[in-house]
């Protein structure tokens, strides 16, 4: 269970880092938002899911 929690936290940190760099790049590019809207929404949905997963796993561990 601890390994699953650690992997979920790592995935959350990695996704946060990717979104931290990727979202401003998408907004700064001329046609970035219209062509990459689905990617940004998918990344945000993944991030929200990981936040809930980390919270659930944390409550099971402690």
From Swiss-Prot:
| Regions that span the bilayer | 8-28, 41-61
The topology of this chain with respect to the membrane is: Multi-pass membrane protein
Q: Which GO terms describe its biological process?
A: photosynthesis; photosystem II stabilization
Q: Which cellular components does GO assign to this protein? A: chloroplast thylakoid membrane; photosystem II reaction center
Q: Which residues does UniProt call coiled coil?
A: none
Places the protein is found: Plastid, Chloroplast thylakoid membrane
Q: List the disulfide bonds.
A: none
Ordered alphabetically, the record's keywords are: Chloroplast, Membrane, Photosynthesis, Photosystem II, Plastid, Reaction center, Thylakoid, Transmembrane, Transmembrane helix
Q: What is its main location?
A: plastid
What is this protein for, i.e. what is its function? May control the interaction of photosystem II (PSII) cores with the light-harvesting antenna, regulates electron flow through the 2 photosystem reaction centers. PSII is a light-driven water plastoquinone oxidoreductase, using light energy to abstract electrons from H(2)O, generating a proton gradient subsequently used for ATP formation.
The subunit field of the Swiss-Prot or TrEMBL record says: PSII is composed of 1 copy each of membrane proteins PsbA, PsbB, PsbC, PsbD, PsbE, PsbF, PsbH, PsbI, PsbJ, PsbK, PsbL, PsbM, PsbT, PsbY, PsbZ, Psb30/Ycf12, at least 3 peripheral proteins of the oxygen-evolving complex and a large number of cofactors. It forms dimeric complexes.
Q: Which family does it belong to?
A: Belongs to the PsbZ family.
Q: What is this protein called?
A: Photosystem II reaction center protein Z
């Amino acid at each position: 269970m601890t390994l699953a929690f650690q992997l979920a936290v790592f995935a959350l940190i990695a996704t946060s880092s990717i979104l931290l760099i990727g979202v401003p790049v998408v907004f700064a590019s001329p046609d970035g938002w219209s062509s990459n809207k689905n990617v940004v929404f998918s990344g945000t949905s993944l991030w929200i899911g990981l936040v809930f997963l980390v919270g659930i796993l944390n409550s099971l561990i402690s």
